């Protein structure tokens, strides 16, 4: 799964989180969050953790094909 960078950045802004604080909130290494932000494909569970930390539904940040 790939996150939509624009949707993810907007959700981060709404939650007042930078990549480092998002990583801490999602309980994952900052490198993983940076990979998500760069458009790398990640496991659904990883995207789910990011979405939960942002308080959004995973479908809200998934890149549409």
Identify the role of each PLM range.
Residues 1-21:
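A short, Lys/Arg-rich alpha-helix, primarily the initiator
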Residues 39-52:
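Short, basic-rich loop-to-helix N-cap that marks the start of a DNA-contacting helix
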Residues 55-65:
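Short C-terminal boundary/hinge segments that cap the last helix of small helical domains
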Residues 22-23, 50:
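Short alpha-helical "recognition helix" segments of helix-turn-helix
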């Amino acid at each position: 799964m790939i996150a939509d960078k624009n949707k993810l950045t907007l959700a981060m802004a709404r939650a007042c989180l930078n990549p480092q604080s998002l990583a801490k909130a999602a309980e994952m290494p900052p490198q993983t969050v940076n990979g998500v932000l760069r458009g790398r494909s990640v496991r659904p569970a990883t995207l789910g953790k990011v979405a939960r930390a942002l308080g959004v539904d995973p479908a809200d940040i998934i890149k549409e094909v």
